[in-house]
Amino acid sequence: MNHYYVYIITNWNNKVLYIGVTNNIARRIYEHKNKLIDGFTKKYNVYKLVYLEEMNDVEAAISREKQLK
């Protein structure tokens, strides 16, 4: 069974939030912490996991991500 994760990460002072979806949360958090992906999270140094929700359906995960945004 596949697992998908909706997650929220923030910066050191909790001023900036990023909401995303992934099928590998450990890899994705590692990428954010080590600034391996150019974009919003690298620019704003967003890396601290503050919320995690697991789902079995990718469409449901994407829908939840949009709801949170």
Give the residues covered by each predicted segment.
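GIY-YIG nuclease catalytic motif and its immediate N-terminal context
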Residues: 1-38, 42-69
